[in-house]
């Protein structure tokens, strides 16, 4: 059996993503630069498991030093994913249960994400998450 090509993988991924509910977004009147004073700088109550990955440099697209990862992250009540950047690695986050707040460099207020929703972490985003 032939391995799927990069295009097939990208198409399948886009179809799955298109069918998912979008997560909370920054209110239009709150889109603004946020210096994130007081941002969490250390993880707490977080289990991050990489379930699978694809080395994209070996695919037709030849994306050197890039991997497509499928991860499961569990954030305990009160747990935090510390401040980090998506300067060079976009991501999609799906909230499986509960609710979690995102504190973003692009929004003046916390963004609530609920179970069943997905959040897009786009290039240039700096943020941290907290399960309240």
Q: Where are the model-predicted features located?
A:
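Short, surface-exposed beta-edge/turn micro-motifs
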Residues: 8, 12-13, 89-90
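A short beta-loop-beta micro-motif enriched in histidine and acidic residues
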Residues: 63-67, 79-95
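Glycine- and acidic-residue-biased ligand/ion/polar-headgroup-sensing regions
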Residues: 88-107, 117
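Short beta-strand His + acidic residue motifs that chelate non-heme Fe in jelly-roll/DSBH
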Residues: 83, 102-103, 121, 126-132
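A short, N-terminal "cap"/entry segment at the start of jelly-roll beta-barrel domains
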Residues: 2-6, 15, 19-69, 110-112, ...
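A short, acidic/glycine-rich surface segment
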Residues: 55-59, 78-82, 127-130
């Amino acid at each position: 059996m032939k391995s799927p090509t990069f295009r097939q993988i990208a198409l399948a991924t886009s179809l799955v993503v298109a069918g998912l509910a979008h997560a909370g977004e920054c209110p239009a009147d709150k889109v603004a630069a946020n210096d994130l004073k007081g941002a969490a700088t250390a993880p707490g109550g977080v289990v991050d498991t990489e379930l699978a990955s694809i080395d994209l440099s070996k695919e037709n697209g030849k994306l050197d030093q890039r991997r497509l990862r499928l991860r499961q992250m569990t954030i305990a009540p009160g747990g935090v994913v510390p401040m980090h950047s998506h300067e060079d690695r976009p991501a999609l986050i799906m909230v499986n249960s509960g609710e979690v707040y995102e504190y973003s460099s692009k929004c003046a207020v916390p963004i609530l994400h609920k179970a069943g929703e997905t959040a897009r972490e786009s290039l240039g985003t700096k943020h941290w998450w907290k399960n309240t």
